[in-house]
């Protein structure tokens, strides 16, 4: 099954669900989805720390939003590929937000007789399906040097 549309998770003032405990009964989130972002820093970090890159570029958020970890990973792959083909190791690129917020889905059945099999909105906490980074307006998302 594919991803739900972004408007299902478009709340700007959302309560972050991150409670994970070693004791399963005390944890709000029973299963944590795996992290899709493989690397957060790419390129030549040593040259960046020495201060040899004269220009810096930062992508900022226009509004409060949730950014899914798979969309951050897709942007990371695209930007890193473009930088690698254009500058070949003479750059430094960093993904700044870390997806902590665990997104949930209360699956609903459709079709004949489905009302007898599901509970509706009783016990509607949902199962975890992905992670997201809660980003505030003006926060940095990507950094390129």
Model-found features: residue ranges?
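Ribosome-associated RNA-binding proteins
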Residues: 1-145
